[in-house]
């Protein structure tokens, strides 16, 4: 009988499960954690998932907004980046806690509490968000390949599909290898922009004042629009699903209160530390935009514009050099590659969680990748590889992210506030109401952004 079941599964490579397996089953509980070690050794064991989540906050889609914010309003919007990062820390900590306490990711929990039809609808919405996120990363990677190697954009877009093979190899080597590779790519981004900001010699006292909120952010319409862009990109819907899943990669006994409590503590520390690094990177991007482009008439609305400007002494002054431009392209490629790894993982989590679809890892990841590459490739062929036209896709991809946001944030706050689900680990009253307030503000801001992007609001 058992052999017949195995044969049946082989014949049906792609199938739907009545009872879904664990979230990211192949790596769930795969990382051992010490039980009686000191603080630093325990933290080292839990460090890793946070960096995978953090890359979503510094992907190519966020770059233009941050640099444009600095170029337009100097250091004034640093306070918006600070507030955005604090919001991200709260929501990502809640996502990790949901996964650790329940052993279910956000997609599985949402599906458990909705009908099959609703599960399918939510999957479509969230899958569109994954595609939107991936589009930004594909475009960023393809443009970086063109800038570095003069590779045609269409070829670069096709090459990005090979990311799937890299991820499959890393999964075979263990989840810690994925964490290490992504951490290395993020370190490259951090070092490149730290170096470029040091060369730009920003005004430090003026820079620090930028972290203090001020009324102009609300009263100045142009400043408000850019602020909305920064805040709107704060919470990436797929990151909440991802965070609730990869927090389960550490091996713990959920029947033991102390182990669960410790896992929540160290996962939260890891998440906050890595999101602090994302905050630093986004700050560096805005500071670079302010130090080099504020007061100039140069356009910094596209990656190619930024690349060219960094080697133009009439725009950035004496520090201009081809090396600065090349470093920018290297960081852009690192950002695109790190984000595609996490985006593909999130695609698997969402597909399995919402519609219980199981297929071989290579097929699932290839499908997720092709769903994102195809629209970009069609767009690139239609516009004959025109970078400006292709980068316009970035703007519209953000609309899908905004639409999907409520479908991630609202369930997250609901489930983590429910004592029947979370027991004593449910949100405290002040956390719950703070989260609801933040969620409401984020949703309103994103709806406003959609209306502006589509031209309904002037």
Curated annotation (Swiss-Prot):
GO BP terms in the entry: iron ion transmembrane transport
Membrane-protein topology: Multi-pass membrane protein
Superkingdom in the source lineage: Bacteria
Key words, A-Z: Cell membrane, Ion transport, Membrane, Symport, Transmembrane, Transmembrane helix, Transport
Keyword Ion transport tagged: yes
Transmembrane intervals: 38-58, 76-96, 119-139, 151-171, 180-200, 223-243, 275-295, 315-335, 370-390, 393-413, 437-457
GO CC annotation: plasma membrane
Cellular localization per UniProt: Cell membrane
Pfam families, A to Z: Nramp (PF01566)
GO molecular function, one term: metal ion binding
Purpose: H(+)-stimulated, divalent metal cation uptake system.
Name of protein: Divalent metal cation transporter MntH
Taxonomic source organism: Lacticaseibacillus casei (strain BL23)
């Amino acid at each position: 009988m058992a052999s017949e079941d195995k044969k049946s599964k082989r014949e049906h490579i792609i199938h739907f499960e009545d009872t879904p397996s664990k979230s990211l089953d192949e790596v769930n509980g795969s990382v051992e954690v010490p039980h009686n070690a000191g603080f630093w050794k325990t933290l080292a064991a839990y460090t890793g998932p946070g960096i995978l989540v953090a890359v979503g906050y510094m992907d190519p889609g966020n770059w233009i907004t941050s640099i444009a914010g600095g170029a337009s309003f100097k250091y004034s919007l640093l306070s918006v980046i600070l507030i955005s990062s604090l919001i991200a820390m709260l929501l990502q900590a809640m996502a990790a806690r949901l996964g650790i306490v329940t052993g279910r990711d956000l997609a599985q929990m949402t599906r458990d509490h909705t009908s099959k039809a609703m599960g399918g609808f939510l999957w479509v919405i969230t899958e569109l968000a994954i595609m939107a996120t991936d589009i930004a990363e594909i475009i960023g990677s393809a443009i970086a390949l063109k800038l570095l190697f003069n590779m045609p954009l269409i070829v670069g877009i096709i090459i990005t599909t090979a990311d799937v093979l890299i991820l499959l190899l890393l999964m075979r080597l263990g989840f810690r290898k994925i964490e290490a590779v992504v951490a290395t790519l993020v370190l490259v981004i951090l070092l490149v922009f730290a170096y470029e900001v040091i060369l730009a010699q920003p005004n430090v006292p003026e820079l620090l004042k930028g972290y203090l909120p001020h009324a102009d952010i609300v009263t100045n319409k142009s400043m408000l629009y850019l602020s909305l862009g920064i805040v709107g990109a704060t919470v990436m819907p797929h990151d909440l699903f991802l965070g609730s899943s990869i927090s389960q990669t550490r091996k713990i006994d959920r029947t033991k209160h102390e182990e669960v409590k410790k896992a929540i503590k160290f996962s939260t520390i890891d998440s906050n530390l890595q999101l602090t690094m994302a905050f630093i990177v986004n700050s560096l991007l805005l500071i670079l935009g302010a130090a080099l482009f504020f007061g100039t008439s140069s356009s910094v609305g596209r990656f190619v514009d930024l690349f060219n400007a960094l080697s133009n002494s009439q725009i950035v002054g004496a520090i201009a050099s081809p090396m600065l431009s090349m470093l920018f392209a290297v960081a852009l490629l690192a950002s695109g590659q790190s984000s595609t790894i996490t985006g593909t993982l999130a695609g698997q989590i969402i597909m399995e969680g919402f519609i219980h679809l199981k297929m071989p890892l290579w097929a699932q990841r290839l499908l997720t990748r092709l769903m994102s590459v195809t629209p970009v490739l069609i767009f690139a062929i239609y516009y004959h590889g025109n970078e400006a036209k292709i980068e316009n896709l970035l703007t519209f991809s953000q609309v899908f992210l905004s639409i999907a946001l409520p479908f991630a944030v609202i369930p997250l706050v609901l489930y983590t506030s429910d004592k029947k689900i979370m027991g004593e680990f449910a949100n405290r009253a002040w956390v719950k109401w703070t989260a609801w307030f933040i969620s409401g503000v984020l949703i309103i801001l994103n709806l406003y952004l959609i209306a502006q992007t589509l031209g309904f609001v002037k």
